Design a protein with these regions (language model features):
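Short hydrophobic/charged patches on amphipathic alpha-helices used for structural packing
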Residues: 21, 81, 163-166
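Conserved AMP-binding A3 loop
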Residues: 90-114
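Conserved pre-ATP/AMP-binding loop-to-beta segment of ANL
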Residues: 57, 74-94, 101, 124-130
Length: 172
C-alpha cells in the first residue's frame, strides 16, 4: 500500500456493524477487502455505506472478487509515485483508548520507519529469526510482522492455540 500512496486501514473483525460503520465513515476508504467468512457483515455494511468504490472478497466462502483481481493483475512492479514523502499517511489503526469509542491513529511513513527501527534494535532482529504473529492483524502486530519480513524473516500466521504455539516454538 505505502509504496503506491495507499493508506492501509485494517478493521477489527470483532466489532459490530454500527462500530464498523463509524470507523469506515471516519476513515473514508475507497476499497474494502473482506474474507468470505465475513460476507454477511460486509453485505450489511454495503447497505449502510455508499461511498466505497469497490467491495472485494477472498477465500473459500467468498465471491472471489479479490482473487480474480489478483489473477488478472500485471506481474510488473507498480509505478511508484514520486510525490510520496516521509510525512504522508501510511496506515491508520483504530483504538478504543480510554473512552471505548474508536479513534483513528494515523501513522506516517516516517513514524512507521522509526517504530520499525526501534523494534529492530530492541529485539535485535536478524534474518534467521522466525516471527509468530498471534496478535490481531487489525492493529500494531501487523506492522511488527512487516518489520520482520523486511529483514527476510519467515512469518508464521496462526489463530492462537497455546499447545500449537508451544510446539512451533520448540521446533524453531
Amino acid at each position: 500500500c505505502g509504496r503506491v500512496g495507499l493508506v492501509a486501514h485494517a478493521l477489527n473483525w470483532r466489532l459490530g456493524s454500527d462500530e464498523l460503520t463509524q470507523i469506515i465513515e471516519n476513515g473514508q476508504p475507497k476499497v474494502i477487502i473482506t474474507q468470505g467468512q465475513f460476507s454477511e457483515i460486509a453485505r450489511d455494511l454495503q447497505g449502510k455505506i455508499n461511498f466505497i468504490d469497490h467491495w472485494l472478497e477472498y477465500g473459500s466462502d467468498s465471491n472471489s472478487s479479490f482473487d480474480i483481481l489478483i489473477e488478472e493483475a500485471s506481474s510488473s512492479e507498480p509505478i511508484v509515485p514520486k510525490n510520496i514523502g516521509d510525512n504522508d499517511p501510511f496506515f491508520i489503526l483504530y483504538t478504543g483508548g480510554t473512552t471505548g469509542i474508536s479513534k483513528g491513529a494515523l501513522h506516517t511513513h516516517k513514524s512507521a520507519y522509526f517504530g520499525m527501527l526501534n523494534q529492530t534494535v530492541a529485539e535485535r532482529i536478524v534474518p534467521s529469526d522466525v516471527y509468530m504473529l498471534t496478535g490481531q492483524m487489525f492493529h500494531i502486530p501487523v506492522l511488527l510482522a512487516m518489520n520482520y519480513t523486511s529483514h527476510g524473516c519467515p512469518i508464521v500466521l496462526m489463530n492462537f492455540d497455546a499447545e500449537l504455539a508451544l510446539n512451533l516454538i520448540q521446533e524453531e
